[in-house]
């Protein structure tokens, strides 16, 4: 390709480029430039009408900008008489697009690569997306919440350097050095930063992973939806807050529920927790779906039909919920909001021939399970931060800010819950009727209950929290577990029969041993006329036999 340029009406230079010179120009052309004080510099300053381009250091050039004409190119001396000529500066050639070659394979490949700090976004709905970049926000270890419900011993074990539980007194100096070093190496442990909801926002995981079926509940915190997870096809209960929680006073309540679920884990009488996340500053919690609704729904349906839960089913509810409370209290937590709307029902079909055991852990094999849910008011027994729940089920000592018997507040609320399921009128929120119940008076139950069960319910609402039975005692109460006494009796009889069987086996073994030893002695004796050792019989006459008797006279 040949190109000519004019300078002041005269021909300045004829440029000749060939394909073979293109690659050579990448390495040789950079060092060819006009020197300061040379005739070329005076020509560029005084005679040439083209704009003057400042000189640039060759170190500032990127690999894609190291493009210049061939080094074996020299100006025409015949033209230099009118206008001293020289090859144009590389920036001028780049503007004229004479030396830029962006279509080489190397340059095309370089332009297709993303920059180190860029993000690549994929179009379309895809569950997995590649996002390039440093990811400093996600990799920052200081943005980690500390669960307040984690046992103190567990927290100390996992949050101290080297996992040591206890240091010896003589190692105090070394311990201080280790702590300072650990603070430098692991600042997230010693200078933890609260991971607020706004920092956990992501794309709409709810719409991507779940298919909303219907709304199944609503409360003060938010709404609950029945959803199907697209991946596994199972039903889940998705709880979403009504309003944004980031930065609000309700944020701690939302996080408290997540903390409690994570610590409690899985128990057959506690609603199972799967995951939690934030979208648009709204907290979303994925829990187990209970197909039987709540106990409050059952009570409402019974009131419409003029029915109520019978005593046998009341005992089953009280037993299973007390077992859930036993697990929660054993974990060092209290629920603080036990009521019918927070007790959920799971109905499942039992297979034919499936035997149900009377053990505590085997109650999960029944056809109906009662589970405790809504852990938004859960607090620690040792370090209580009480957030009062429903005032209709609130114990009087909690109102007086006496937190010495926190687990017994759940027992009080459970007693009133069973009374409502038995057909009692709705509970008052205040006034004299509210205080009347706090004096140990059980609400009136329209159905006839057995005296022993009625006495147990009155004990649950006793004004003195010390007199109320703990959840562990309720889970083993003989009134609730009718088969406990019978099972103990049957177990005792079984042990007696096992002992008798063992004695008979010993006697049988001794008899067999004696019979074997008798045969050996008989074989060692010399043969006697008239006796047969095989049958131990006596021959009389020709072929007649008579049994041999060793009995003595007089006996």
Swiss-Prot record:
* PTM comment text: Subject to proteasomal degradation in the nucleus.
Query: Which residues bind Mg(2+) per the record?
Result: 342, 374
Write out the tissue specificity statement of the associated record.
Detected in egg (at protein level). Oocyte-specific maternally supplied protein. Present in immature and mature oocytes and in early (pregastrula) embryos, but not in post-gastrula embryos.
Enzyme Commission number(s): 2.7.10.2
- Swiss-Prot/TrEMBL keywords: ATP-binding, Cell cycle, Cell division, Coiled coil, Cytoplasm, Kinase, Magnesium, Meiosis, Metal-binding, Mitosis, Nucleotide-binding, Nucleus, Phosphoprotein, Transferase, Tyrosine-protein kinase
Chain sites annotated for binding ATP: 216-224, 239
Where composition is biased (Low complexity), the residues are 68-78
Q: Which one Pfam family would you cite for this protein? A: Pkinase
Q: Where is the composition biased (Polar residues)?
A: 38-48, 149-160
Q: Where is the active site?
A: 337
In residue numbers, the region (Disordered) covers: 1-81, 149-175
Task: Tell where it localizes.
Answer: Nucleus; Cytoplasm, Cytosol
**Catalysis: reaction(s):** L-tyrosyl-[protein] + ATP = O-phospho-L-tyrosyl-[protein] + ADP + H(+)
InterPro entries listed in its UniProt record: CC_SR_Kinase, Kinase-like_dom_sf, Prot_kinase_dom, Protein_kinase_ATP_BS, Ser/Thr_kinase_AS, Wee1-like_protein_kinase
GO cellular component terms? cytoplasm; cytosol; nucleus
**Coiled coil located at which positions?**
487-513
PTM sites of type Phosphoserine? 549
Q: Which residues form the Protein kinase domain?
A: 210-480
Membrane-spanning residues where? none
Which biological processes are named by the entry's GO terms? cell division; meiotic cell cycle; mitotic DNA replication checkpoint signaling; peptidyl-tyrosine phosphorylation; regulation of meiosis I; regulation of mitotic nuclear division
Q: What are the recorded GO MF terms, alphabetically?
A: ATP binding; magnesium ion binding; non-membrane spanning protein tyrosine kinase activity; protein tyrosine kinase activity
According to the record's subunit comment, the protein's assembly and interactions are: Interacts with prmt5; this promotes protesomal degradation of wee2-a in the nucleus. The interaction with prmt5 is disrupted upon activation of the DNA replication checkpoint.
Write out the function statement from the record: Oocyte-specific protein tyrosine kinase that phosphorylates and inhibits cdk1 and acts as a key regulator of meiosis. Required to maintain meiotic arrest in oocytes by phosphorylating cdk1 at 'Tyr-15', which inhibits cdk1 activity and prevents meiotic reentry. Negative regulator of mitosis. Involved in the mitotic DNA replication checkpoint.
Which family is this sequence assigned to?
Belongs to the protein kinase superfamily. Ser/Thr protein kinase family. WEE1 subfamily.
Q: Which PANTHER family match?
A: EUKARYOTIC TRANSLATION INITIATION FACTOR 2-ALPHA KINASE EIF2-ALPHA KINASE -RELATED (PTHR11042), WEE1-LIKE PROTEIN KINASE 2 (PTHR11042:SF75)
Q: Write down what this protein is called.
A: Wee1-like protein kinase 2-A
From the UniProt record, report the name of the gene that encodes this protein: wee2-a
